[in-house]
Amino acid sequence: MSLSKEVKSFQWTQALRRELQGFTSDVKAAVIKDATSLLNGLDFSEVSNVQRIMRKERRDDKDLQRLRSLNQTVHSLVDPKSTSKKNVLKVGRLSAEELMTLAADLEKLKAKIMRTERPQASGVYMGNLTAQQLDQRSQILQMVGMRRPQQGASGVVRVWDVKDSSLLNNQFGTMPSLTMACMAKQSQTPLNDVVQALTDLGLLYTVKYPNLSDLERLKDKHPVLGVITEQQSSINISGYNFSLGAAVKAGAALLHGGNMLESILIKPSNSEDLLKAVLGAKKKLNMFVSDQVGDRNPYENILYKVCLSGEGWPYIACRTSVVGRAWENTTIDLTNEKLVANSSRPVPGAAGPPQVGLSYSQTMLLKDLMGGIDPNAPTWIDIEGRFNDPVEIAIFQPQNGQFIHFYREPTDQKQFKQDSKYSHGMDLADLFNAQAGLTSSVIGALPQGMVLSCQGSDDIRKLLDSQNRRDIKLIDVEMTKEASREYEDKVWDKYGWLCKMHTGVVRDKKKKEITPHCALMDCIIFESASKARLPDLKTVHNILPHDLIFRGPNVVTL
């Protein structure tokens, strides 16, 4: 859905500046004072060492300890700080609708950031492997004739081999005072010259995003800007880098006026008003959380920074003492609000309280995702398990290649094991982390009066009726068993990678081994049989993200 949307980045920035001008302040004097303190108090030989560490492709616990130690020194030398504070938002200054929008956007932002922090290159997982494993993998790749994957435009993938990844949180943000101090000391330039150069960069930022061409022109007037790197900053490169983004932020902090977001101060007394203003700007310009991995857009950036800490300067302050992430430190409490009026007869497909197992933010995210379903496109549905205890549900639209596919932990484990032997071949242990509440939520969010095709309608009709979806119509194609499964092998050969849950041996009543039944594969098989050809799907994707289908530990992986 969001692929069709355009992030009008600078336009959004300007809108946020207008809406939040009442929360800005003059921070120039404080930033220069801190830069002076850092110039006098920091050991810049250690700064140079940390910069070297940050250029390494693989970094370990010792490297992290060194970074954290230097960050603590910086923290002790500066005044503007962000403090670690849990923020619970309830209905009051913010309406229930605004809170639910906020919760949904935080959930989307979490999904985006987690994907960004698990970088992949050419389909190769670059996760938390040890240095020895990475060396062994490089040797094996060379042995089998594979070259090392080329890195994309986002910069070098940095791998952290650390025991406790939570210690990485909040250790990498840039600070204007630190950027200024490093530029002055490491380029051997007076601090006043650095201030003048960055101020000009900040003035340019009031009308556009400065780029490398702008930087090149400004170097004639301000040679110190030559220390700014032309390479795009990679993920988590630390606050000691000389990126253009760090320099622009510093320039913005030095401007008195301009309503720069970098000078926002958030306090417990104004945090709700500030968030309300952010949501107001979002609504006016249709801002959104993009599903594309990479740098945050202006709305995502301010949302994360404000929700990370409920007190301090979210853009320019030292935040190394802040614990947790934005979605952990800001929570939405709607427990005392009746979001939906009590009704003895629920309206089919109407939005109601989230089902057991789904949070409010997950419910809002699901509602947004389900908006991508075309109510008029041919659609197949199939289930595995019993209508009153389904374990797998798939809804497939062959015209656009999108589908909804999820699982459910069974209530009747004895019946499940029987069905596994003779039908689906699924392992009970693989379903323990399946997200509860999806069945009711997904079926409830299907478009009103939708028409679904199926092969055998009895169980599906009962399932829909049990969810008060009698408005949904079923077309039973009523093929013979043999005809319906004519394309089974071809479908599994081409699309079997879409589902890896059917791992068991399945036998028919004559004890002959057969292919396990998968709800998604069956939808594609029935589509093929009805058209007498295998569908040629240009794209195929599940509209439900993995972390909505399965519960998982709240662990940050970088």
From Swiss-Prot:
BP GO terms, sorted: negative stranded viral RNA replication; RNA-templated viral transcription; symbiont-mediated suppression of host cytoplasmic pattern recognition receptor signaling pathway via inhibition of IKBKE activity
InterPro entries for this protein: Nucleocapsid_arenaviridae, Nucleocapsid_C_arenaviridae, Nucleocapsid_C_sf, Nucleocapsid_N_arenaviridae
Binding-site list for Mn(2+): D382, E384, D522
GO molecular function: hydrolase activity; metal ion binding; RNA binding
Gene3D superfamilies assigned to the protein according to its UniProt record, in alphabetical order: Arenaviral nucleoprotein, C-terminal domain, Arenavirus nucleocapsid protein, head domain
UniProt subcellular location: Virion; Host cytoplasm
Annotated spans, Binding site for the cap structure m7GTP: 54-237
Domain notes: The N-terminal region is important for the cap-binding activity while the C-terminal region contains the 3'-5' exoribonuclease activity. A CCHE zinc binding site is present in the C-terminal region and may thus contribute to the substrate binding and/or the specificity of the exonuclease activity.
Subunit structure: Homomultimerizes to form the nucleocapsid. Binds to viral genomic RNA. Interacts with glycoprotein G2. Interacts with protein Z; this interaction probably directs the encapsidated genome to budding sites. Interacts with protein L; this interaction does not interfere with Z-L interaction. Interacts with host IKBKE (via Protein kinase domain); the interaction inhibits IKBKE kinase activity.
Protein name: Nucleoprotein
Species this protein is from: Lymphocytic choriomeningitis virus (strain WE)
